[in-house]
């Protein structure tokens, strides 16, 4: 059938190591995406603020 169905499961230590790596990568991407607007606004020349009037 499908060859992936019969593969061995990785041991717990290897799975935890991979999970830590993936969580660290995800966290770093979140930090980069959250910090990007602040960094871009710091380096932009225009000092205009966005004002929304209701």
Curated annotation (Swiss-Prot):
<feature type="modified residue" description="N-acetylmethionine">
    <location>
        <position position="1"/>
    </location>
</feature>
<comment type="subunit">
    <text>Forms part of the receptor complex that consists of at least 6 different proteins (TOM5, TOM6, TOM7, TOM20, TOM22/TOM9 and TOM40).</text>
</comment>
<keyword id="KW-0496">Mitochondrion</keyword>
<comment type="function">
    <text>A component of the complex responsible for the recognition and translocation of cytosolically synthesized mitochondrial preproteins.</text>
</comment>
<keyword id="KW-0812">Transmembrane</keyword>
<keyword id="KW-0813">Transport</keyword>
<protein>
    <recommendedName>
        <fullName>Mitochondrial import receptor subunit TOM6 homolog</fullName>
    </recommendedName>
</protein>
<keyword id="KW-0007">Acetylation</keyword>
<keyword id="KW-1133">Transmembrane helix</keyword>
<feature type="transmembrane region" description="Helical">
    <location>
        <begin position="21"/>
        <end position="43"/>
    </location>
</feature>
<dbReference type="GO" id="GO:0005742">
    <property type="term" value="C:mitochondrial outer membrane translocase complex"/>
</dbReference>
<keyword id="KW-0472">Membrane</keyword>
<keyword id="KW-1000">Mitochondrion outer membrane</keyword>
<keyword id="KW-0653">Protein transport</keyword>
<dbReference type="InterPro" id="IPR034554">
    <property type="entry name" value="TOM6_plants"/>
</dbReference>
<dbReference type="GO" id="GO:0015031">
    <property type="term" value="P:protein transport"/>
</dbReference>
<dbReference type="GO" id="GO:0005739">
    <property type="term" value="C:mitochondrion"/>
</dbReference>
<comment type="similarity">
    <text>Belongs to the Tom6 family.</text>
</comment>
């Amino acid at each position: 059938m499908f060859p992936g169905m019969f593969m061995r499961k990785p041991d717990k230590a290897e799975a935890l190591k991979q999970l830590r790596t993936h969580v660290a990568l995800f966290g770093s991407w979140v930090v980069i995406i959250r910090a990007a607007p602040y960094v871009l606004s710091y380096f932009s020349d225009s000092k205009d603020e966005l004002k929304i009037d209701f």
